[in-house]
Amino acid sequence: MKREWWHSLTVYQIYTRSFCDSNGDGIGDFGGILQKLDYLQELGVGAIWLSPFNDSPNYDNGYDVSDYYKVMEEAGTMEELEELIAACEKREIVVMMNLVLNHSSHLHPWFLEARKDRNSKYHDFYIWKEGTKEQPPEGGGAFFGGSTWEWVPEVQEYYYHSFSVMQPDLNWKNPSLRKELYRMIQFWMDKGIRGFRLDAIDNIVKDGHGGNDTHSEQIHTYLMEMNQNTYGKSEQILTVGETGGATVEMAQQYSDPESQELSMIFQFELMGIDGIRSGNWDPKPYTLPQLKQLFEKWQTGLEEKGWNSLFWGNHDFPRVVSRFGNDREPYREKSAKMLAVLLHGMKGTPYIYQGEEIGMTNVSGLRIEDYQDIESVNFAEDRKKEGWEEEKIRTYLARNSRDHARTPMQWNAEKHAGFTAGTPWMAENQNYEEINVENSRKNPDSLFYFYQKLIALRRKNDTLVYGDFRLIEEENPDIFAYERNLGEKKLIVLCNFRDTAAEMKARYDLTKGTVLIHNDTESLTKEVWKLQPYEAYMIELLQ
């Protein structure tokens, strides 16, 4: 496998409007990120991935772009973005931007012209079907609720939208549209952007029946064309495609260097293991062996061909420690460290979502009217129409809402968690006086420094980056154990997922190994690997 510069780095995802506000308007911005670059450099990340910053009416927090060449006013100015990119370059931090290429805003000039006249050159930039106002075309439901079709009386046609009615899908069959998108990507590359996260990129091909054909070979054809015309011209560009339903075989094709499509993808099989935000949002129980099998499938499936992205969550899912760990004291930080060891010990490029490195948790006690995420708002409205009791709706929102990940970053114990001098666009989590960056940096044993150590390990340990993956005792219900092998070196990772002690038979004499990272003070014996609640080890052995 050819070694790439992005194999050993760690990416930090910034949800800009919730990260840091520099001008007191209550919304995070480029100036706020610039103020915190030294913090990110201290953490050790090699890239920052910024949430959408193109001009937008913000019905979906920037995922509805009205101008691909401008930045949204709330985020700052083009000059401030250029200053941020330059400051990152000095710190050897790559800036990645979000590209929303499946759809635009309904207020984009292309769509405003398209909806006026069937003969407009922009009409075919979107997807239309004839019908009557009373009889829409056949099709499934949109991701954010309701029909995928919306009537436009001016042209007597329906337009297609995978997400909300304010996000009409672009027609990738049109070569003129694709040319416009490629020109735009080159514009941002010329600005110094060195990474792109391609939003919902597996939705760009439609099945002809009111749905997205996420398994179409045509997607790969388009991606190869885009690669050849834009980012593929430079080895310094990192790309990751959001392909939620991708199989291992599809991921191999997307991320195999021979295919010349993408560096890697985000697949969401892990994100769906417990039923969060999938189907009707009902909880889905799972076992630790099932979790192991899922990780093993992706680790071994992309071992020789392609590359994994590693993540526990992002802006679309509840907080990591609340979902997969234990956010109650005394186990919040310890379980978060365990989850970090498990993920960062695997093969792939790790992604950290802002606040994960200090153990931010889900917010509690929200009323239905407090939720701001468009998906949560629509879910509540739809369930009310179905006759659900308010308490049941609140329970489902408390477990599933994307808003948990979008509360302001907790910098210190001051008002509004140090996020803003004004009124925050979204209320902060009320545990900010305890859980914040300032407290973490004061404590040498904190989660922040634990992440710092893991990130540094990946930069210098080839076994951690390129070693083969092998699961150990896949049926053990309490301990997730695996090894990584490269040449004469072996890494052993042991993680106890329980709030009680657990053990397994020793496979190797780890007393002769070098402990690379550990979240407890206990030591292992030759005969039995006994782990305390949420204890985690990463140990290196010479074979």
Predicted regions located by residue number:
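Active-site and adjacent substrate-binding regions of carbohydrate-active enzymes
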Residues: 1-543
